Each structure stands twice: as structure tokens, then as C-alpha cells.
Amino acid sequence: MATRGPAGLGADDAERGAGPTVRDATEDDLAAIVAIYNAAIPGRTATADTEPVTVESRRAWLRERDVGRHPVWVCESEGRVVGWLSFGKFYGRPAYAATAELGLYVEPGARREGVATRLMKQAFARGRGLGLDTFLGFVFAHNDASIALCRRFGFETWGHLPRVAVLDGVDRDLLILGVRLGDRSSED
């Protein structure tokens, strides 16, 4: 069941019967959020973390967010959290207040089922209402699926940091993908 949180998410999807719903994350969702994140670590494509994180380490991360500008949303299907999206502060300085770094993770069993697309559509639909005008994604250059998702939503490569990460002894490049919300011309 979708619930209405500070950002007012969830009710519109549920009322339309549109499948999975997107809603504000709560502390009750932390176990699922952490499990989904930790499932991404072994693949070495979606995060620079190399060891699992704990629910307790994420509790402060969730509590300290300004949900009016930098919320965490979960995508729920059949009562189960199958993905999540976070809006992170970019660089933490006032001049960057309208820019957010997006983090998006999907449960392995729910990948390629439209979960990431649903979360991204919500981000674009509600981003301006959060006071945001620019989204950034920091994506490993070998993460083809995330790059393709971002490209579908109009993200362009704004930076390329060669060999800045070492994962299992392999140097990895990091791409900075960006989009201005008013410039978006693809995925509706």
C-alpha cells in the first residue's frame, strides 16, 4: 500500500492502478534499502563500496536528509521494496543547492522490469517541486545499464575521470552524467 509522506508520493500511482508505486522511504524500509544496495556491491559496477553496509550505518543517512529537497524514495511492488532512489546534495555548498546527485538501485530480481524507469520518471516529474534544476549521476564507465538508463532521460557526459577507482585490482573510470531539467528531450 502506498503511503503519503512529506513529498506526497505514492497516492497518484496507487489510484491509477499503475503497478509498482513510488513513495517516500521510512526507517522501516532501511533493511530493504540496505539489502538492495549490498546486492549491488559484488558486481563492481554500481558502487565504489567494496564491503556491505549496515542498516545502522544508513539510519543517520536517512534521518539527516532534507526530505523537502533531498528525499529517498522507494519503489514498491506487491508490498515489497524493489528499488530506491536518493537525491544527494552536490558538494554541500549553497551555490549548488538546485543540483542533486541521484543514486538509484534495483533489487536483482526486479531489474529490467521498469523499476528504474518508474523512479527516474518520478524524479523528473517532481524535481522542480523539490527546488532542483540539475541532476547528476556519477556512473562507472563500465556500467552499461546505468549509462543507457541515464541517456534515455537526456543525461549527457559532463565529465570523465579516468582510472579514479580501483575495484579488485582493476582501474575504473568514472563518468559524470548530467542533465538540466528544462533541457530534457527524451523519455517522457
Predicted regions, residues:
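Glycine-rich phosphate/pyrophosphate-binding loop shared by adenosine-nucleotide-utilizing enzymes
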Residues: 20, 80-84, 172
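A short beta-loop-alpha structural element at the N-terminal edge
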Residues: 21-33
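Conserved GNAT-fold acetyl-CoA-binding loop/helix
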Residues: 34-62
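Acetyl-CoA-dependent GNAT
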Residues: 52-109, 120, 126, 180-182
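Conserved catalytic-core motifs of GNAT/GCN5-like acyltransferases
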Residues: 86-89, 94, 136-139, 151, ...
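Conserved beta-strand-loop-alpha-helix junction that forms the acyl-donor binding cleft
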Residues: 111, 137-147
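Conserved acetyl-CoA-binding loop-helix of GNAT-fold acetyltransferases
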Residues: 112-125, 147-152
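Conserved GNAT acetyl-CoA-binding A-motif
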Residues: 127-139
